[in-house]
Amino acid sequence: LDIEYFFTDTGEELDEVYEYLNMLEGYLGKPINYLDPKRDFKFWMTQYNNFLPSAQARWCTVRLKLTPFEKWVDEEFLQKGIKVKSYVAIRSDESFREGLQSKKEIETVLPFKENHIDKQAVFEILENSGLGLPKYYEWRSRSGCTFCFFQRKIEWVGLMERHPEAFENAKRMEKTALDNGSPFTWCQSESLVELSKPE
């Protein structure tokens, strides 16, 4: 297979993500294309009336992940008549996930789902390859940008302890959102200010 690897960089990733991508490039022996959305998270937040993204309004995924990917595929492949298959790492134990659909010219393939590979099997593949798991799995259950709204509360506590500057940045964004009438906080039912108060 002629595979091009890519990473859609939101500009709000944990340092551990970049460390792992560097290791992965060495393992693959091929560069990973970093796709830049051109406009950062804060720009798009202002475009969405300073509302935070949520499970119901995932503008961050569309603007910072899907749109740059589609642009790259269109310019590098589709306009040149090259057919594209996009391999998406949704696992077999994630039956609730379908992934955001991109352009109809891009065929989406879900190899983990198709081959019944669950989270434990993915971890085993990574361990057996010698790569191991990304360091953020020491305290997080999933990948995603620094302040992904899918994080559990304990993961926000982990962010506060391990990356206090990123946690403070997320608090500032949340305050901006709340000051502008956003119905969402990063965590369901409690703000990061409340979460960070000692008990």
For each feature predicted by the language model, list its residue ranges.
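Nucleotide-activated chemistry modules centered on ATP-dependent adenylation/adenylyltransferase
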Residues: L1-E199
